[in-house]
């Protein structure tokens, strides 16, 4: 028989917000007597944008911008109803994207 598991994937641009959110989730899960694994860091995705500096000529003069998307995974094994309720009521920062799979 397979045990029930919750997998939480977090994405964000800032690592400090991401780690604080992971710590809040792990703290609430351990407070309700659930076993957690993580935060497991996934590869950071870099997007680089190349833009011409001048509007008309000078193609050799370019500027590069990049965004980095950091990802973490947290697994919660054998969650109970209080764990799920406390995770739903948890308040996380606005810059963090959360995907929850049961």
Swiss-Prot record:
Listed GO molecular functions?
Answer: structural constituent of ribosome; tRNA binding
Residues crossing the lipid bilayer are: none
Alphabetic keyword roster = Chloroplast, Plastid, Ribonucleoprotein, Ribosomal protein
Keyword Hydrolase on entry? no
Q: Where is this protein found?
A: Plastid, Chloroplast
SUPFAM superfamilies from the UniProt entry: Ribosomal protein S10
Q: Which Gene3D superfamilies match?
A: Ribosomal protein S10 domain
S-S bridge residues: none
Q: What is its main location?
A: plastid
Protein origin, superkingdom: Eukaryota
Q: Name one Pfam family in it.
A: Ribosomal_S10
Alphabetized InterPro entries for the sequence? Ribosomal_uS10 (IPR001848), Ribosomal_uS10_CS (IPR018268), Ribosomal_uS10_dom (IPR027486), Ribosomal_uS10_dom_sf (IPR036838)
Q: Name one GO cellular component term.
A: ribonucleoprotein complex
* Entry's Gene Ontology BP terms: translation
| Assembly notes | Part of the 30S ribosomal subunit.
HAMAP family, per this entry? Ribosomal_uS10
Q: Report the protein's function.
A: Involved in the binding of tRNA to the ribosomes.
Q: Which family does it belong to?
A: Belongs to the universal ribosomal protein uS10 family.
This chain belongs to which protein, by name? Answer: Small ribosomal subunit protein uS10c
